[in-house]
Curated annotation (Swiss-Prot):
Lipidation (S-palmitoyl cysteine): C45
Gene name as annotated: HTR2B
InterPro entries: 5HT2B_rcpt
Family per record: Belongs to the G-protein coupled receptor 1 family.
Function text: G-protein coupled receptor for 5-hydroxytryptamine (serotonin). Also functions as a receptor for various ergot alkaloid derivatives and psychoactive substances. Ligand binding causes a conformation change that triggers signaling via guanine nucleotide-binding proteins (G proteins) and modulates the activity of downstream effectors.
The name this protein goes by in its record: 5-hydroxytryptamine receptor 2B
GO cellular component: neuron projection; plasma membrane; synapse
Domain of life from the UniProt record: Eukaryota
Glycosylated residues in this chain: N2
Motif segment (NPxxY motif): 24-28
Domains as described in the record: Ligands are bound in a hydrophobic pocket formed by the transmembrane helices.
Bilayer disposition of the protein: Multi-pass membrane protein
Gene3D superfamilies cross-referenced by the UniProt entry: Rhodopsin 7-helix transmembrane proteins
Amino acid sequence: CNQSTLQMLLEIFVWIGYVSSGVNPLVYTLFNKTFRDAFGRYITCNYKATKSVKTVRKCSNKIYFRNPMTENSKFFMKHGMRNGINSTMYQSPVRL
């Protein structure tokens, strides 16, 4: 292949990338119902609470929430774990 053909192919592929990036949001909007619903709520400022947060109990003016991330963090802190690894089970090879 000569240099001008390679340059032309490079230009074509770059433009294909631009067009793909421009069309991608339209494709998501048209074909993905979850994306359409979320986008519609975002545009109209109609926010809903997430389903993963559960109300555990109410005491006076305080509301306590429970979700998997906070429960795991509490468990790891209670049992002296980092990243799910108990410090007595794992010794770093760097330590002397």
